[in-house]
Structures are given as C-alpha cells and as structure tokens.
Amino acid sequence: MAKIIPGREPVFREYAKKIEAAVAKDPHCLAILKLHYLRWVLFDIGGATYFMYQGIFDTDFDKYTEDAVSLFGATGIDTVFENLEGFPKDWKTNAPAFVEFVRKHQQSSFLEYGEYPFVSADEIKKALALKAS
C-alpha cells in the first residue's frame, strides 16, 4: 500500500486498461508472474489517495518482483508504481530497490484462505483444459 503522487490517479486507471488490452490480445502475457489473482484498489486516507496492489502468485516474493521488473523491461512498458511517492527512479536497473520499496509498503495479512492452497495456477489450468477435452 502506498501513497499516490497527487494528481496521478487517472494514470492508474489508464494503466489498468493497458493491462486488460494486453491480456485480451495475449492471454499469456503475464504468465511469467505465475499469478492466481491480481487486484488494484485506490482509496482515500485523510484526503490523500493510496494504491493497494494485491497479488496471489506461485513464486516467492523476491522472484515475483524480479520477474515483474524483467517483464516491464522486455515489453518496454513502465510500471504504474512510478506514480507512487518514494518509488525508486532507477527501478529498471535496480531490482533490489524495487523489492525494497514493495517490502517497505507491504501490509501483513491476518487471514488468508485458498481453496487450493497447494496447487499452482499452471496445475489448475491443466486440470481445466483436461476437463474441457
């Protein structure tokens, strides 16, 4: 969770539309991230707008973040995180700074539930493909 640079709220919605379009064009474009679930939320705290990024993925945290940096670099797309206060300007060449920023802004959950806690997203996709055949 992190504070948005004032006036940048529309950038988040535009960026979300870019991701939706990319996934519509190529459903596997985010595959490297091994995502089960991704959710973005904008909300106000004391008159300031904050961004919450919630992702459930199959890799460990550092690998997920490094893969995200790699994905952005390979596609030439910048990250919407550039619109967050304190986000490192050198994130493209400094993955550890990206990881540190995200860890610093991470909020620990006190309850999590997964219907399939020991099954990867890839295994779920395989099972669904088998069922459909």
Regions found by a protein language model. Give the residues of each.
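Short S/T/G/P-rich N-terminal loop/turn motif that feeds into the first structured element of a domain
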Residues: 1-50, 55-66, 70-72, 87-133
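Conserved His + Asp/Glu catalytic blocks
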Residues: 74-84
